């Protein structure tokens, strides 16, 4: 259990700062290109680890479909859509919206993992929805279409991440974690780079020091290292319990965004973040009844 706690803490700290690093990176590099390179950089050291450990690199034929689905969910569905939407949303707010993921996980797990909904989880879902209303409210009232579009993209990415978490627990429980992550990152990278080549003006990328640093941080730490740790944690404890720890990530992201990027933290964002964190807690904490 100590290893699980250390894994959760390391993931939380790294992912808390990831949003600032991403915002810095996509300022100079188109979002799909940034995402594709990030996944590629994250995948390379994982393949090296497999090679050093003399583990089989190829994918078994019967598992190929699962790897492709995982790549679509985490590559295009999560990383691609998230980074594209982040162009229009502050880093801290992006994190708050992405970490509605545990609420999606709880709902999906009810139907696929037999982790049943109860009154507390239902209350948590309601809290999360009200939190989203607080965050979306300003853009909906002011008809800020670009910000609203970006926020909806981030929510779609959160849903895709939630589906991927449950899918990994169903399909990859007995498959080597490093092997699974190496391949779904590499396959996702190829997909994103193809989309970038088709839809983005790649020559517009500016390879500044900040952009290169952001890519390395996001690729090696935020992707390669943390994805392995996170999916390992998911195999050790309930998916919903693991997701509860992630409520601290948006709090750190809001702080880092305010500290480094001078992003504004409004009362709506604070209330929305609190309600979403409350929703995550209600969805994932195990409430026990005392016998009288």
From Swiss-Prot:
Q: Which residues cross the membrane?
A: 6-26, 32-52, 68-88, 94-114, 123-143, 147-167, 182-202, 214-234, 242-262, 265-285
* InterPro entries linked: AA-Vitamin_Transporters, EamA_dom
UniProt name for this protein: Uncharacterized transporter YoaV
The similarity comment for this entry is: Belongs to the EamA transporter family.
Q: Does the keyword Cell inner membrane apply?
A: no
Localization per Swiss-Prot or TrEMBL: Cell membrane
Q: What is the lineage of its organism?
A: Bacteria, Bacillati, Bacillota, Bacilli, Bacillales
Pfam families, alphabetically?
EamA
Q: Which UniProt keywords apply?
A: Cell membrane, Membrane, Repeat, Transmembrane, Transmembrane helix, Transport
Q: Which GO terms describe its cellular component?
A: plasma membrane
Q: Which PANTHER family match?
A: INNER MEMBRANE TRANSPORTER, S-ADENOSYLMETHIONINE_S-ADENOSYLHOMOCYSTEINE TRANSPORTER
EamA domain span: 13-137, 159-285
Q: How does it sit in the membrane?
A: Multi-pass membrane protein
SUPFAM superfamilies found in the cross-reference section: Multidrug resistance efflux transporter EmrE
Entry superkingdom: Bacteria
The primary location reported for this protein is membrane
């Amino acid at each position: 259990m100590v290893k699980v706690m250390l894994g959760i803490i390391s993931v939380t700290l790294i992912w808390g700062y990831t949003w600032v690093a991403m915002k810095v990176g996509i300022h100079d590099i188109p979002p799909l290109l940034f995402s594709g390179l990030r996944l590629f950089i994250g995948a390379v050291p994982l393949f090296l680890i497999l090679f050093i450990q003399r583990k089989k690199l190829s994918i078994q034929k019967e598992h190929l479909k699962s790897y492709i689905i995982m790549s679509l969910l985490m590559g295009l569905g999560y990383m691609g859509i998230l980074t594209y939407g982040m162009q229009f949303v502050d880093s801290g707010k992006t994190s708050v919206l992405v970490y509605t993921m545990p609420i999606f996980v709880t709902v999906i797990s009810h139907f696929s993992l037999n982790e049943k909904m109860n009154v507390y989880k239902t209350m948590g879902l309601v809290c999360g929805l009200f939190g989203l209303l607080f965050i979306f409210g300003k853009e909906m009232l002011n008809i800020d279409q670009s910000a609203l579009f970006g926020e909806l993209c981030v929510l779609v990415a959160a849903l895709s991440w939630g589906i991927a978490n449950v899918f990994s627990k169903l399909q990859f429980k007995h498959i080597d974690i490093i092997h699974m992550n190496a391949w779904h990152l590499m396959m996702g990278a190829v997909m994103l780079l193809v989309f970038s080549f088709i839809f983005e003006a790649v020559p517009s990328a500016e390879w500044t020091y900040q952009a290169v640093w952001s890519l390395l941080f996001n690729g090696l730490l935020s992707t390669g290292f943390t994805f392995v740790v996170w999916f390992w944690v998911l195999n050790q404890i309930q998916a919903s319990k693991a997701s509860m720890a992630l409520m601290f990530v948006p709090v750190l992201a809001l702080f880092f965004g305010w500290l480094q990027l001078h992003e504004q933290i409004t009362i709506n964002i604070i209330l929305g973040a609190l309600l979403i964190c409350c929703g995550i807690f209600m969805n994932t904490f195990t409430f026990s009844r005392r016998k009288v």
